[in-house]
Amino acid sequence: GLAVTAWILSHRGKTVLVDGGYFFLGGIIWNVGVTLGFVGILSGEASGLEGLQMPLHVLPILFTGFALIGISLIQTNNRRTDEETSPAQWFLFTATLWLPWVLGGAFLLIHYFKAKGVMANIVDWWFIQNFTKVYLTFVALGVCSHFFSLFSGRGVIGRGYAVFAFWILLIFGSIGGISVGSPVPAWLPALSTVSAVFYFIGAVAIWYVLHHTQNGASALDDSDKDNFSLMRFALIIFASISILNFFSKFLR
């Protein structure tokens, strides 16, 4: 995700990767942190939290590595020569800013402000919600938006819908994450259910945009057909997961 984000931001901004040394160093630190995290989990040092399983000492390493990568990506976006940004840039740039925020916030709440018991689980569920519904989803949508526009030879169809979807997915994807029946105050699962409904509306809007954008790509070289078919398959998976996630929020 990090490498393709750097490539698309550079390509869309019609510039080169700025401060590549930070990106390279951050990538090394990030991979070291991931490796130490897996070793820690396998050696029995897991935290016991579903989304933040890695040991305490690993999370600052991951945050530092991603922060260095983020510096390079932010600088690359700021040095773009094309002032108008595309939906692919919106999604990828936001994902770049979002992961360190939720990772750092969850780390501070659990390990610095000492959230314990159910409160620690609520923070953990909030992190999972943001990591999956905002970071990973935005990276995927950014990649699909870029390649659909590239293969069709035009911008996305329905830019207004794309703006609407972006904000709906960002706002309602960042709250909730608590399943119905969880041992928490009743308003938390209710809030999660409501946010899931609005998130589904945003998912439908961005699916509409990407579906109509890829419909214009009818004349492709043979070398591009497989790649484009893969992007279409990814769009189908996104739609299917969005539907399943929507209905799962109403199941106890």
Regions found by a protein language model. Give the residues of each.
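Short, motif-level signal for alpha-helix interfacial/capping segments enriched in acidic residues
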Residues: G104-A115, F247-L251
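Membrane-interface helix-loop-helix modules in multi-pass inner-membrane proteins
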Residues: G1-E83, L108-G117, G173-F200
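Membrane-interfacial loop-to-transmembrane alpha-helix junctions, especially the N-terminal start
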Residues: K14-N31, E84-T96, G153-L169, D222-L235
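Functional transmembrane alpha-helices
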Residues: G1-L2, N121-C144, S152, I157-F166, ...
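Catalytic cores of extracellular degradative/oxidative enzymes
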Residues: A95-F107, N130-L136, A140-S152, F172-V184, ...
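Hydrophobic membrane-spanning alpha-helices of multi-pass integral membrane proteins
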Residues: I28-G33, G65, A95-L103, T137, ...
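Aromatic- and glycine-enriched pocket-lining scaffold segments that form the walls
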Residues: P87-L109, N121, W125-F127, V163, ...
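Structural signal for the C-terminal ends of transmembrane alpha-helices
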Residues: I8-G13, I74-R80, H146-S152, L210-A217
